[in-house]
């Protein structure tokens, strides 16, 4: 019996690489939804809502059976950090993260078109940065790497040395909690 098509509602190269590394066959159809929190919305609820909206919006405009949406945010001292708007914002974010613990939250959703079913979850990983010097921050921002990353850093790239420790899923910090997503896809019959 053919399982049907899985569609990843994201153009993130990191999410594509992660899902492919688990041997999952999928198509890609990026979603384009507004990414603004609702006043008073909890960070995990925000990330999960965006993931749900991405999965459902993608299902409305493309073929497939299961639609996987995801959104990753960084939360530090109560501030939800998405992608920086410019280099100055990236510097500000990295200064705030310097030497402190923060949370990386990825909300993910799997929409099953055939059953009109929706599974939504949030995975939280705690990350601690070493204290960063302004020169380190400036040099990293100058690479351009932080500009499309929540919290202005990529744990798997040039910012790896900034991370003192993590508690939780490494792949969650990269952009997709792979263990959880693959297990849920298996559980619902997509794999």
UniProtKB/Swiss-Prot annotation:
Record Pfam families: Maf (PF02545)
Top-level enzyme category: hydrolase
Top-level taxon of the source organism: Bacteria
Reactions this protein catalyses: dTTP + H2O = dTMP + diphosphate + H(+); UTP + H2O = UMP + diphosphate + H(+)
Entries under InterPro entries matching the protein: ITPase-like_fam (IPR029001), Maf-like (IPR003697)
Its EC number(s): 3.6.1.9
Family: Belongs to the Maf family. YhdE subfamily.
Protein task: Nucleoside triphosphate pyrophosphatase that hydrolyzes dTTP and UTP. May have a dual role in cell division arrest and in preventing the incorporation of modified nucleotides into cellular nucleic acids.
Name under which the protein is recorded: dTTP/UTP pyrophosphatase
Origin organism lineage: Bacteria, Pseudomonadati, Thermodesulfobacteriota, Desulfuromonadia, Geobacterales
């Amino acid at each position: 019996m053919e399982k049907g098509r899985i569609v990843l509602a994201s153009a993130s190269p990191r999410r594509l690489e992660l899902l492919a590394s688990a041997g999952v066959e999928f198509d890609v159809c990026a979603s384009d939804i507004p990414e603004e929190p609702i006043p008073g919305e909890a960070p995990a609820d925000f990330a999960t809502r965006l993931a749900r909206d991405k999965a459902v919006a993608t299902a409305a405009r493309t073929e497939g059976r299961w639609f996987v949406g995801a959104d990753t945010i960084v939360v530090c001292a109560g501030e939800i950090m998405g992608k920086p708007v410019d280099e100055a914002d990236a510097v500000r974010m990295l200064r705030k993260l310097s030497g402190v613990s923060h949370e990386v939250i990825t909300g993910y959703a799997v929409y099953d078109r055939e059953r009109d079913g929706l599974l939504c979850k949030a995975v939280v990983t705690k990350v601690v940065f070493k204290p960063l010097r302004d020169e380190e921050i400036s040099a990293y921002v100058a690479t351009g790497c932080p500009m499309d990353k929540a919290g202005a850093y990529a744990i798997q790239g040039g910012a790896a040395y900034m991370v003192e420790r993590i508690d939780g899923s490494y792949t969650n910090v990269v952009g997709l909690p792979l263990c959880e997503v693959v297990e849920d896809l298996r559980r619902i019959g997509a794999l």
